[in-house]
C-alpha cells in the first residue's frame, strides 16, 4: 500500500516565504560576522608600538619649516617620514631623488604586507569571487573561440570533459533529487515511443520529450537530443548506468542528468506486451522496433565499435510445435536448463539419447530445436510462458535475425486496441493495460485461498493481496471465481471465500488504482457463484448445516444491498438463484459445466417433447407455454441482457436462460401472494365475503400484466409458481398420479370431527341434533351431487389443474423450509379458494348459501343445547329446596348470558368457515373419484367394443 502514497507538494507561497526567511537569516548572520570583525580590528589597533625618534638641534626662536614633501623641520632641514629610508645629506640631489622613488614603492607595499599578515573572512570571500569571475571569463573566451569555428546549437553533443558518472557537468545543475535524464546524440529515426519502450523497462516514466530541430542548421546536424523523466531517482540512475554509451542507429548515446521537472501524479503506461525491451544480462544484443526497421543496440566496448548487422543472412523464424505435449516438455526443459546450466543439459542429453521425446536436442536443424534455443534465450531475458517479445532481434553475432512466434490470442481485439493506444502525456487520459499475475503471485494467491478460513486475519491478508494487485483484477477475480465454483470445496472454505469476495467489494471504493474494477468483474461472475451455492445448499442433508449456510449467504446478500453495490433487481436475482428449488426445471450448474452443449440440446429437446405431451392440460395449467415460447423467440443478446440485469447466470444456453427467467418470474409472483396471507382466515362479524372477494380480486389484477399474452381456453392463467409436471406425469398422457395419503388423512380427520360432533350432540340432546345434522348433510350431499353429475369435461379439467397446482405449491412451500403444517395448510387453502374464484368454480352466491345453511344448523344445535340445559336445571330444582333469587344474582346471570352470546357468535363464525373448508375438500375429492370412475367406465366400454 505504500506505493500509492503521494508526497504533498509545497505551494508557491510557501516556497517564497521559506526563501525570504532563509535570505533574511543569511543577512543577519553576515551582519553579525562583519560587526565582530569590526570590533576585533579596533581591539588590535590599541596596542602601542615603539617608534624611532631622529635626533637634531632645536633653536628656541626658530619655527619649524615645511619641506616639499609636506614634513616639518625646525632647523630648516628635511625631515624624513616615519619608517622611511635614511639618505645622507651629503649626497647630491639627483642621487637623493633616485633613492626616494624606490622608497615610495616600498611604502605603498608595506601597508599591503601588514594587511596580509592578518586575514579576514571577508578577504577570503572576495578572493573566491575573483576566482569565480576569472573562471567565468575563461569559459566565455573558450566558447567564443568555439563559436568562431562552428555556430552553437542546443543539439550539440556533450563536451569531451563531460563526466558520465554523475558529477556536475554542463547539463547538470547539481540537484541530487532530479529524476530527469538528458539523452544526447539521438538518431533522427528515434521518436518518443522508442524512448518510452527503451527506458520503460527500468521503471515508471513521468514524461518523454525529444527536442526536434527547428532551423535548417539544426536539421543539417542530423542528430537530436531529448529528456526522459522517471518517477524516482533510483530508476533513472539505473537507466543512466545501463544506457550510457549504447549505440542506436549508429549513434552513441550520451546520457546525463538534466534539470529537475515537476512529476505528474500518474506515470505513463508501460509498453504493451510483445513490445517491451528486455534488459540484457551479459551484454547481448537488444532489439527495439523503430519506424523503418529494427534498430540494433549493442554495448560499446570501445570508441571504434561498429553496428553488428548482417543483412545478407536469412532470418530464423521460430515456429511453435503443434504437439501440445512436446511444447510443454520443451518449455519445462528450458526452465530447468536455465537453472541447472550446461551440466543439467548435458545430463539430459546423455540419458535421453534414443528417446523420441528428446529427439529435438540432437537434430540441430529441426524446428523443435530452434524453438528450444529461442525458449532458452527468451527465459534468460525475462520473458514468460504467456508473454514474450515479438520483434525480430539478433541473438548470435553474425547470424540472422530471430523472429519469435506471435503471442497467443487471449483478449478481444477491442481490448488490444485499447492497450495499444497512447495519447499525449498530461493532456488526455491514457488507456491502461491490464496486466496479469506472475506465476509466483498466482501461486501465492492460490495458496491463500486453499488455506483460507473464517479468521479475520486470513481474510484481511487475502483482501490486501487483491488490492495490491488491483491492476490485475481480471485474473484475481478469475482465480477466486474458479475456487468458488468447485464442487469438491468444503462448506466452511466456500463460505470463507464468499466473505473474501464481500471484503474486496467493500474496499472497491478505496483510493487504490483500478480497485473499482473489482465491482465490474464480480458483477459478471456472481450469478455463476450463486448457482454453485444453490447446488451446494440443495445437496446438504443435515438441516442445521443447511440453515447455517442459508443464514450466512442471505446475510451477505443483505449487506450488499445495504451498501448499494448492485441494483435491487440484481441482488434479488442472486437471492432467488440461491433459494431456487430442485423442481424449478433448471439443470444443475455443475452438470451443465461438465457437458454444456449436450445438456443444452438434450434439455431443449426434452422440454419440447414434454410440452407436447402435457398439452393442453399441463401447459395450460402451469401457464408458461406462451411465455416460454415468447422468450425462446427473443434474440440471444436480449436474453443475456435480461439475465445480467436480473443477476442470473448465462451458463447452459438459451433454454436454461429462459427457464431461469420463468423461475424468477414465479418467485416474484410468490412474493406478491405473500401479501394475501395477511388477510385474516376467520373474518370478524363486520367483514363479509364480498369484501374479502374484492380484496383478492384487487391483488389478482395487480399481476395481470405478467400473465400470458396469447389467448388460451381458460378464463385466466394460474398465477402461482409452478415447476414442470414431469414428476407427476406417468407413461399415459392423462393418467395423473396423486399422493393418496394426503387426501386420506384429510378425509379421516373430517370424519373424526363429524363423529365427535354427532356423538357430543347425541349425548347432550338425546339424538335430536344428530337427526337434524343428518338431514342437513343429506340435503347438502344431494345439492353437491347434482353439479357433479352434470359437470362437463371443461370443469373436470379445471378441477384437475387446480389439484395439480396445489400439490406442486405444497411441495414448493416444504422445499422453501416451511416446517409448520398448519401454516402450509392455511396457505394451500388460500390458494385453492383463489384458484376456484379465478376459474369460476365458486362465487359469492355459493358462499352466502353455504353460510346460511351452516348458520341455520348451528342455531338448531344451540337451541337444543339450551333446551337440554333448561331441563337439567328443572331437574335440579325439583331435587333441591327452592331459593329466592336476589338482584345481584340476576345481574350475574344477565352478564353470563351476554358472554355466552358473544362466545356463541364467535363459535358460529368459526364453525361456518371450518365447515365450508371441509365441504370444499370433500367435494373436490368426490369429483376426482367420480372422474376416475367415469374414465374407468369409458375404458371398459372401449374394450367391450373391441
UniProtKB/Swiss-Prot annotation:
GO cellular component: nuclear speck
Any one Pfam family match given in the protein's UniProt record, by short name: CID
Source species of the chain: Arabidopsis thaliana
Biological process according to GO: mRNA processing; red or far-red light signaling pathway; regulation of photomorphogenesis; regulation of RNA splicing; response to red light; RNA processing; RNA splicing
Protein name: Protein RRC1
Residue ranges of every copy of the RRM domain listed in the record: 179-260
Gene that encodes it: RRC1
Region described as Disordered: spans on this chain: 1-29, 41-183, 740-797, 836-946
Domain remark from Swiss-Prot or TrEMBL: The RS domain (871-946) is required for phytochrome B signal transduction through alternative splicing regulation.
Lineage, top ranks: Eukaryota, Viridiplantae, Streptophyta, Embryophyta, Tracheophyta
UniProt function note: As a member of the SWAP1-SFPS-RRC1 splicing factor complex, modulates photomorphogenesis by regulating the gene expression and pre-messenger RNA (mRNA) alternative splicing of a large number of genes, including those involved in plant responses to light signaling. SR-like splicing factor required for phytochrome B (phyB) signal transduction and involved in phyB-dependent alternative splicing.
Amino acid at each position: 500500500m505504500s506505493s500509492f502514497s503521494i508526497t504533498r507538494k509545497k505551494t508557491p507561497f510557501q516556497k517564497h516565504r521559506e526563501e525570504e526567511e532563509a535570505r533574511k537569516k543569511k543577512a543577519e548572520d553576515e551582519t553579525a560576522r562583519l560587526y565582530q570583525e569590526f570590533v576585533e580590528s579596533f581591539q588590535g589597533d590599541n596596542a602601542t608600538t615603539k617608534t624611532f625618534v631622529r635626533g637634531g638641534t632645536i633653536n628656541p626662536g626658530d619655527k619649524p619649516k615645511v619641506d616639499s614633501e609636506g614634513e616639518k623641520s625646525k632647523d630648516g632641514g628635511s625631515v624624513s617620514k616615519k619608517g622611511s629610508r635614511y639618505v645622507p645629506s651629503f649626497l647630491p640631489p639627483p642621487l637623493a631623488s633616485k633613492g626616494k622613488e624606490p622608497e615610495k614603492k616600498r611604502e605603498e607595499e608595506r601597508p599591503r604586507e601588514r594587511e596580509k599578515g592578518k586575514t579576514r573572512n571577508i578577504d577570503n570571500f572576495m578572493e573566491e569571487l575573483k576566482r569565480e569571475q576569472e573562471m567565468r571569463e575563461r569559459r566565455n573566451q573558450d566558447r567564443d573561440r568555439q563559436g568562431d569555428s562552428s555556430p552553437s546549437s542546443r543539439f550539440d553533443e556533450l563536451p569531451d570533459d563531460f563526466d558520465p558518472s554523475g558529477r556536475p557537468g554542463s547539463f547538470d545543475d547539481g540537484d541530487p533529487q532530479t529524476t530527469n535524464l538528458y539523452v544526447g546524440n539521438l538518431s533522427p529515426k528515434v521518436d518518443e515511443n522508442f524512448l518510452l519502450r527503451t527506458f520503460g523497462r527500468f521503471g515508471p516514466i513521468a514524461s518523454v520529450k525529444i527536442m526536434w530541430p527547428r532551423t535548417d542548421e539544426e536539421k543539417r546536424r542530423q542528430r537530436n537530443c531529448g529528456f526522459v523523466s522517471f518517477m524516482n531517482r533510483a530508476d533513472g540512475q539505473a537507466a543512466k548506468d545501463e544506457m550510457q554509451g549504447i549505440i542506436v542507429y549508429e549513434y552513441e548515446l550520451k546520457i546525463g542528468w538534466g534539470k529537475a521537472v515537476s512529476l505528474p501524479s500518474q506515470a505513463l503506461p508501460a509498453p504493451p506486451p510483445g513490445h517491451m525491451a528486455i534488459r540484457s544480462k551479459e551484454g547481448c544484443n537488444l532489439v527495439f522496433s523503430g519506424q523503418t526497421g529494427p534498430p540494433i543496440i549493442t554495448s560499446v566496448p570501445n570508441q571504434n565499435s561498429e553496428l553488428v548487422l548482417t543483412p545478407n543472412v536469412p532470418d530464423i523464424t521460430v515456429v511453435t510445435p503443434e504437439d501440445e505435449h512436446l511444447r510443454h516438455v520443451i518449455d519445462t526443459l528450458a526452465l530447468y536448463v536455465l537453472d541447472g546450466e550446461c551440466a543439467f543439459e548435458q545430463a539430459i542429453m546423455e540419458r535421453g539419447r534414443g528417446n523420441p521425446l528428446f529427439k529435438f536436442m540432437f537434430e540441430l536443424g529441426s524446428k523443435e530445436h530452434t524453438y528450444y534455443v529461442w525458449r532458452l534465450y527468451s527465459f534468460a531475458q525475462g520473458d514468460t510462458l504467456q508473454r514474450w517479445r515479438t520483434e525480430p532481434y539478433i541473438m548470435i553475432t553474425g547470424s540472422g535475425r530471430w523472429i519469435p512466434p506471435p503471442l497467443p490470442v487471449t483478449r478481444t481485439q477491442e481490448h488490444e486496441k485499447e492497450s495499444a493506444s497512447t495519447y499525449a502525456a498530461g493532456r488526455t487520459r491514457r488507456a491502461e493495460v491490464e496486466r496479469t499475475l506472475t506465476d509466483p503471485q498466482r501461486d501465492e494467491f492460490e495458496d491463500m485461498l486453499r488455506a483460507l478460513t473464517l479468521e479475520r486475519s486470513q481474510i484481511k491478508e487475502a483482501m490486501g493481496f487483491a488490492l495490491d494487485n488491483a491492476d490485475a483484477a481480471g485474473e484475481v477475480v478469475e482465480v477466486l471465481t474458479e475456487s468458488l465454483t468447485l464442487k469438491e470445496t468444503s462448506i466452511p472454505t466456500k463460505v470463507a471465500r464468499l466473505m473474501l469476495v464481500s471484503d474486496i467489494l467493500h474496499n472497491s471504493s478505496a483510493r487504490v488504482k483500478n480497485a473499482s474494477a473489482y465491482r465490474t468483474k464480480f458483477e459478471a461472475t456472481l450469478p455463476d457463484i450463486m448457482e454453485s451455492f444453490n447446488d451446494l445448499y440443495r445437496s446438504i442433508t443435515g438441516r442445521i448445516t443447511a440453515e447455517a449456510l442459508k443464514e450466512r449467504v442471505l446475510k451477505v446478500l443483505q449487506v450488499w444491498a445495504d451498501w448499494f453495490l448492485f441494483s435491487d433487481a440484481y441482488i434479488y436475482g442472486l437471492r432467488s438463484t440461491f433459494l431456487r428449488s430442485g423442481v424449478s426445471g433448471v439443470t444443475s450448474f455443475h452438470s451443465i459445466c461438465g457437458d454444456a452443449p449436450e445438456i443444452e440440446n438434450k434439455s431443449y429437446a426434452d422440454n419440447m417433447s414434454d410440452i407436447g405431451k402435457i398439452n393442453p392440460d399441463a401447459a395450460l395449467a402451469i401457464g408458461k407455454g406462451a411465455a416460454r415460447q415468447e422468450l425462446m423467440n427473443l434474440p440471444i443478446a436480449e436474453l443475456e441482457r435480461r439475465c445480467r440485469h436480473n443477476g442470473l447466470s448465462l451458463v447452459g444456453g438459451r433454454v436454461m436462460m429462459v427457464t431461469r427467467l420463468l423461475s424468477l418470474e414465479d418467485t416474484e409472483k410468490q412474493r406478491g401472494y405473500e401479501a394475501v396471507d395477511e388477510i385474516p382466515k376467520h373474518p370478524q362479524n363486520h367483514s363479509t365475503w364480498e369484501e374479502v372477494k374484492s380484496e383478492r380480486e384487487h391483488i389478482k389484477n395487480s399481476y395481470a400484466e405478467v400473465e400470458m399474452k396469447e389467448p388460451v381456453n381458460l378464463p385466466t392463467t394460474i398465477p402461482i409458481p409452478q415447476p414442470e409436471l414431469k414428476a407427476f406425469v406417468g407413461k399415459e398422457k392423462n393418467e395423473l398420479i396423486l399422493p393418496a395419503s394426503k387426501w386420506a388423512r384429510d378425509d379421516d380427520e373430517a370424519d373424526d370431527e363429524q363423529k365427535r360432533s354427532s356423538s357430543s350432540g347425541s349425548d347432550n340432546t338425546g339424538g335430536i341434533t344428530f337427526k337434524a345434522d343428518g338431514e342437513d348433510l343429506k340435503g347438502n350431499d344431494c345439492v353437491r351431487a347434482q353439479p357433479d353429475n352434470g359437470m362437463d369435461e371443461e370443469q373436470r379439467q379445471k378441477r384437475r389443474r387446480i389439484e395439480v397446482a396445489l400439490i406442486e405449491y405444497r411441495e414448493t412451500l416444504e422445499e422453501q423450509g416451511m416446517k409448520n403444517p398448519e401454516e402450509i395448510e392455511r396457505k394451500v387453502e388460500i390458494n385453492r379458494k383463489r384458484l376456484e374464484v379465478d376459474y369460476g368454480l365458486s362465487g359469492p352466491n355459493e358462499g352466502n348459501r353455504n353460510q346460511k345453511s351452516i348458520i341455520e344448523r348451528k342455531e338448531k344445535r344451540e337451541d337444543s343445547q339450551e333446551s337440554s340445559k333448561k331441563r337439567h336445571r328443572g331437574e335440579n330444582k325439583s331435587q333441591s329446596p327452592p331459593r329466592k333469587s336476589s338482584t345481584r344474582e340476576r345481574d350475574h346471570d344477565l352478564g353470563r348470558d351476554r358472554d355466552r352470546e358473544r362466545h356463541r357468535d364467535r363459535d358460529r363464525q368459526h364453525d361456518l368457515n371450518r365447515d365450508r373448508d371441509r365441504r370444499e375438500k370433500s367435494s373436490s375429492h368426490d369429483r376426482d373419484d367420480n372422474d376416475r370412475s367415469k374414465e374407468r367406465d369409458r375404458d371398459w366400454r372401449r374394450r367391450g367394443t373391441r
